A protein has these predicted regions:
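A structural signal for multi-pass alpha-helical bundles of membrane permease subunits
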Residues: 4-265
Length: 265
Protein backbone atom coordinates (compact mmCIF):
# COMPACT_ATOMS: atom_id res chain seq x y z
CA UNK A 1 0.00 0.00 0.00
CA UNK A 2 2.87 2.35 0.77
CA UNK A 3 4.28 1.80 -2.70
CA UNK A 4 0.93 2.50 -4.33
CA UNK A 5 0.52 5.66 -2.26
CA UNK A 6 4.01 6.81 -3.23
CA UNK A 7 3.36 6.17 -6.91
CA UNK A 8 0.08 8.06 -6.65
CA UNK A 9 1.83 11.00 -5.01
CA UNK A 10 4.44 11.10 -7.78
CA UNK A 11 1.77 10.95 -10.46
CA UNK A 12 -0.16 13.76 -8.77
CA UNK A 13 2.99 15.88 -8.57
CA UNK A 14 3.70 15.36 -12.28
CA UNK A 15 0.15 16.37 -13.18
CA UNK A 16 0.12 19.43 -10.92
CA UNK A 17 3.62 20.67 -11.80
CA UNK A 18 2.57 22.60 -14.96
CA UNK A 19 -0.29 24.25 -13.04
CA UNK A 20 2.03 25.24 -10.20
CA UNK A 21 4.58 26.70 -12.63
CA UNK A 22 1.81 28.61 -14.40
CA UNK A 23 0.68 30.11 -11.09
CA UNK A 24 4.25 31.10 -10.25
CA UNK A 25 4.69 32.93 -13.57
CA UNK A 26 1.45 34.84 -12.90
CA UNK A 27 3.14 36.69 -10.04
CA UNK A 28 6.30 37.91 -11.75
CA UNK A 29 6.60 41.46 -13.15
CA UNK A 30 4.93 42.04 -16.54
CA UNK A 31 8.20 42.58 -18.41
CA UNK A 32 9.64 39.35 -17.02
CA UNK A 33 6.41 37.56 -17.95
CA UNK A 34 6.76 38.88 -21.49
CA UNK A 35 10.32 37.57 -21.72
CA UNK A 36 9.26 34.19 -20.36
CA UNK A 37 6.29 33.92 -22.74
CA UNK A 38 8.53 34.58 -25.75
CA UNK A 39 11.14 32.07 -24.57
CA UNK A 40 13.80 34.71 -23.96
CA UNK A 41 13.98 33.70 -20.29
CA UNK A 42 13.39 30.33 -18.60
CA UNK A 43 10.43 29.62 -16.36
CA UNK A 44 10.78 30.85 -12.80
CA UNK A 45 10.57 28.31 -10.00
CA UNK A 46 9.75 31.08 -7.53
CA UNK A 47 8.01 34.44 -8.13
CA UNK A 48 11.11 36.55 -7.50
CA UNK A 49 10.64 39.46 -7.58
CA UNK A 50 7.00 39.09 -6.51
CA UNK A 51 4.55 41.33 -8.36
CA UNK A 52 0.76 41.55 -8.79
CA UNK A 53 0.98 43.95 -11.75
CA UNK A 54 -0.19 41.29 -14.21
CA UNK A 55 -3.42 40.94 -12.25
CA UNK A 56 -3.90 44.69 -12.02
CA UNK A 57 -3.51 45.04 -15.77
CA UNK A 58 -5.88 42.13 -16.38
CA UNK A 59 -8.60 43.38 -14.04
CA UNK A 60 -8.42 46.86 -15.55
CA UNK A 61 -9.61 45.52 -18.91
CA UNK A 62 -13.34 45.79 -19.45
CA UNK A 63 -13.15 43.07 -22.12
CA UNK A 64 -12.07 40.57 -19.49
CA UNK A 65 -14.98 41.32 -17.19
CA UNK A 66 -17.48 41.22 -20.06
CA UNK A 67 -16.25 37.78 -21.12
CA UNK A 68 -16.04 36.59 -17.52
CA UNK A 69 -19.66 37.42 -16.72
CA UNK A 70 -20.81 35.98 -20.05
CA UNK A 71 -19.13 32.70 -19.18
CA UNK A 72 -20.23 32.61 -15.55
CA UNK A 73 -23.91 33.45 -16.04
CA UNK A 74 -24.50 31.17 -19.00
CA UNK A 75 -22.40 28.30 -17.64
CA UNK A 76 -24.12 28.29 -14.25
CA UNK A 77 -27.51 28.50 -15.94
CA UNK A 78 -26.67 25.55 -18.20
CA UNK A 79 -25.44 23.55 -15.20
CA UNK A 80 -28.65 24.15 -13.24
CA UNK A 81 -30.82 23.12 -16.20
CA UNK A 82 -28.64 20.08 -16.87
CA UNK A 83 -28.87 18.86 -13.27
CA UNK A 84 -32.65 19.28 -13.18
CA UNK A 85 -33.24 17.60 -16.54
CA UNK A 86 -30.77 14.82 -15.76
CA UNK A 87 -32.31 14.11 -12.35
CA UNK A 88 -35.86 13.87 -13.68
CA UNK A 89 -34.85 12.01 -16.84
CA UNK A 90 -32.63 9.64 -14.91
CA UNK A 91 -35.48 8.87 -12.51
CA UNK A 92 -37.82 7.98 -15.37
CA UNK A 93 -35.27 5.80 -17.16
CA UNK A 94 -34.18 4.07 -13.96
CA UNK A 95 -37.48 3.41 -12.20
CA UNK A 96 -40.24 3.14 -14.78
CA UNK A 97 -40.75 -0.54 -15.78
CA UNK A 98 -41.23 0.04 -19.49
CA UNK A 99 -39.32 -1.36 -22.44
CA UNK A 100 -39.10 2.01 -24.11
CA UNK A 101 -37.11 3.28 -21.11
CA UNK A 102 -34.43 0.67 -21.80
CA UNK A 103 -34.43 1.60 -25.49
CA UNK A 104 -34.07 5.31 -24.70
CA UNK A 105 -31.26 4.57 -22.25
CA UNK A 106 -29.46 2.68 -25.01
CA UNK A 107 -30.00 5.60 -27.37
CA UNK A 108 -28.52 7.96 -24.78
CA UNK A 109 -25.49 5.69 -24.55
CA UNK A 110 -25.00 5.79 -28.32
CA UNK A 111 -25.31 9.58 -28.34
CA UNK A 112 -22.61 9.81 -25.69
CA UNK A 113 -20.20 8.09 -28.09
CA UNK A 114 -20.51 10.96 -30.56
CA UNK A 115 -17.83 13.64 -30.17
CA UNK A 116 -19.23 17.16 -29.69
CA UNK A 117 -17.51 18.32 -32.88
CA UNK A 118 -19.89 16.16 -34.94
CA UNK A 119 -22.85 18.30 -33.88
CA UNK A 120 -21.22 21.65 -34.66
CA UNK A 121 -22.21 21.75 -38.32
CA UNK A 122 -25.88 20.75 -37.74
CA UNK A 123 -26.16 23.33 -34.96
CA UNK A 124 -24.62 25.98 -37.20
CA UNK A 125 -27.01 25.23 -40.07
CA UNK A 126 -30.07 25.30 -37.80
CA UNK A 127 -28.91 28.53 -36.18
CA UNK A 128 -28.19 30.13 -39.54
CA UNK A 129 -31.58 29.13 -40.93
CA UNK A 130 -33.36 30.57 -37.89
CA UNK A 131 -31.13 33.67 -37.58
CA UNK A 132 -29.84 32.64 -34.16
CA UNK A 133 -26.12 33.04 -34.78
CA UNK A 134 -24.16 35.08 -32.23
CA UNK A 135 -26.53 34.11 -29.42
CA UNK A 136 -24.86 32.55 -26.35
CA UNK A 137 -27.74 30.09 -26.07
CA UNK A 138 -26.19 28.17 -28.99
CA UNK A 139 -23.18 27.41 -26.83
CA UNK A 140 -24.93 26.31 -23.67
CA UNK A 141 -28.21 24.70 -24.76
CA UNK A 142 -26.40 21.55 -26.02
CA UNK A 143 -24.63 21.35 -22.66
CA UNK A 144 -27.82 21.89 -20.67
CA UNK A 145 -29.51 18.98 -22.48
CA UNK A 146 -26.49 16.74 -23.01
CA UNK A 147 -27.21 12.99 -22.78
CA UNK A 148 -24.35 12.34 -20.37
CA UNK A 149 -26.17 13.92 -17.43
CA UNK A 150 -29.30 11.80 -17.83
CA UNK A 151 -27.21 8.65 -18.28
CA UNK A 152 -25.13 9.54 -15.21
CA UNK A 153 -28.15 10.14 -12.98
CA UNK A 154 -29.85 6.98 -14.27
CA UNK A 155 -26.88 4.92 -13.18
CA UNK A 156 -26.93 6.68 -9.82
CA UNK A 157 -30.66 6.12 -9.22
CA UNK A 158 -30.49 2.46 -10.22
CA UNK A 159 -28.92 1.85 -6.81
CA UNK A 160 -32.06 3.11 -5.04
CA UNK A 161 -33.96 0.01 -3.79
CA UNK A 162 -37.29 -0.54 -5.53
CA UNK A 163 -38.65 -2.06 -2.33
CA UNK A 164 -38.16 1.24 -0.53
CA UNK A 165 -40.06 3.04 -3.27
CA UNK A 166 -42.98 0.61 -2.95
CA UNK A 167 -43.01 1.06 0.82
CA UNK A 168 -43.14 4.84 0.50
CA UNK A 169 -46.00 4.60 -1.99
CA UNK A 170 -47.94 2.30 0.36
CA UNK A 171 -47.53 4.95 3.05
CA UNK A 172 -49.25 7.45 0.78
CA UNK A 173 -46.23 9.17 -0.71
CA UNK A 174 -46.74 10.71 -4.13
CA UNK A 175 -44.13 10.85 -6.88
CA UNK A 176 -43.43 14.51 -6.06
CA UNK A 177 -42.82 13.72 -2.38
CA UNK A 178 -40.68 10.75 -3.31
CA UNK A 179 -38.52 12.92 -5.56
CA UNK A 180 -38.25 15.89 -3.22
CA UNK A 181 -37.86 14.23 0.19
CA UNK A 182 -36.11 10.98 -0.69
CA UNK A 183 -34.46 10.79 -4.09
CA UNK A 184 -33.19 14.38 -4.22
CA UNK A 185 -31.23 14.12 -0.92
CA UNK A 186 -30.03 10.65 -1.92
CA UNK A 187 -28.85 11.94 -5.31
CA UNK A 188 -27.27 15.17 -4.02
CA UNK A 189 -23.65 13.90 -4.24
CA UNK A 190 -24.26 12.76 -7.81
CA UNK A 191 -25.94 16.03 -8.75
CA UNK A 192 -23.03 18.02 -7.31
CA UNK A 193 -20.54 15.90 -9.24
CA UNK A 194 -22.59 16.38 -12.41
CA UNK A 195 -22.72 20.14 -11.78
CA UNK A 196 -18.92 20.26 -11.49
CA UNK A 197 -18.37 18.20 -14.65
CA UNK A 198 -20.89 20.25 -16.62
CA UNK A 199 -19.36 23.50 -15.37
CA UNK A 200 -15.93 22.36 -16.53
CA UNK A 201 -17.26 21.47 -19.98
CA UNK A 202 -19.19 24.72 -20.39
CA UNK A 203 -16.40 26.93 -19.10
CA UNK A 204 -13.72 25.41 -21.34
CA UNK A 205 -15.51 25.70 -24.68
CA UNK A 206 -13.26 26.84 -27.52
CA UNK A 207 -14.39 25.46 -30.89
CA UNK A 208 -18.08 26.24 -30.38
CA UNK A 209 -17.66 29.98 -29.62
CA UNK A 210 -15.25 30.48 -32.51
CA UNK A 211 -17.71 28.92 -34.94
CA UNK A 212 -21.10 30.05 -33.61
CA UNK A 213 -20.44 33.41 -31.93
CA UNK A 214 -18.38 35.97 -33.83
CA UNK A 215 -19.44 38.95 -31.71
CA UNK A 216 -16.62 39.53 -29.21
CA UNK A 217 -19.04 41.09 -26.71
CA UNK A 218 -20.92 37.78 -26.46
CA UNK A 219 -18.02 35.36 -26.51
CA UNK A 220 -17.01 33.51 -23.34
CA UNK A 221 -13.70 33.95 -21.59
CA UNK A 222 -12.23 30.76 -23.05
CA UNK A 223 -12.58 32.13 -26.59
CA UNK A 224 -11.28 35.62 -25.78
CA UNK A 225 -8.27 34.40 -23.83
CA UNK A 226 -6.12 34.31 -26.97
CA UNK A 227 -7.14 37.84 -27.97
CA UNK A 228 -6.48 39.16 -24.46
CA UNK A 229 -3.04 37.59 -24.45
CA UNK A 230 -2.25 38.78 -27.99
CA UNK A 231 -3.11 42.39 -27.18
CA UNK A 232 -1.22 42.30 -23.87
CA UNK A 233 1.25 39.39 -23.97
CA UNK A 234 2.69 40.45 -20.63
CA UNK A 235 -0.48 39.28 -18.84
CA UNK A 236 -0.72 35.88 -20.53
CA UNK A 237 0.05 33.95 -17.34
CA UNK A 238 -2.38 35.88 -15.15
CA UNK A 239 -5.11 35.48 -17.77
CA UNK A 240 -4.47 31.74 -17.95
CA UNK A 241 -4.68 31.31 -14.19
CA UNK A 242 -7.82 33.46 -14.05
CA UNK A 243 -9.46 31.21 -16.64
CA UNK A 244 -8.94 28.03 -14.60
CA UNK A 245 -9.63 29.55 -11.18
CA UNK A 246 -13.47 29.26 -11.32
CA UNK A 247 -13.21 25.56 -12.22
CA UNK A 248 -10.83 24.98 -9.32
CA UNK A 249 -13.18 26.77 -6.92
CA UNK A 250 -16.19 24.73 -8.06
CA UNK A 251 -14.28 21.46 -7.73
CA UNK A 252 -12.98 22.50 -4.31
CA UNK A 253 -16.49 23.41 -3.13
CA UNK A 254 -17.81 20.00 -4.20
CA UNK A 255 -14.95 18.20 -2.45
CA UNK A 256 -15.42 20.22 0.75
CA UNK A 257 -19.15 19.49 0.74
CA UNK A 258 -18.56 15.78 0.30
CA UNK A 259 -15.90 15.77 3.01
CA UNK A 260 -18.12 17.57 5.51
CA UNK A 261 -20.98 15.17 4.75
CA UNK A 262 -18.77 12.15 5.41
CA UNK A 263 -17.61 13.60 8.73
CA UNK A 264 -21.20 14.29 9.75
CA UNK A 265 -22.14 10.71 8.89
Amino acid sequence: LAGIAGAGAIAAAVVLLPVVLLCVQAFVPPFDALMISTGSEPLRLLPIPFSAEQWQMLFNQSTYWQAFWNSLIWTVGACVVQVMVAFLGGYVLAKYPARWCVAIAGLYTLMMLMPPQMTLLPIYRVAYANKLLNHPMLLYAPIAFAPFGTFFMRQWLLRWPDELTEYLRLEGGSSVKLLWYCLAPYSLPGMLALFALTFTEGWNQVEQPLMLVSDSLRQPLSALLKDLSAGNPQIVFAASVASILPIALVMLAVLVQQGSKRKAA
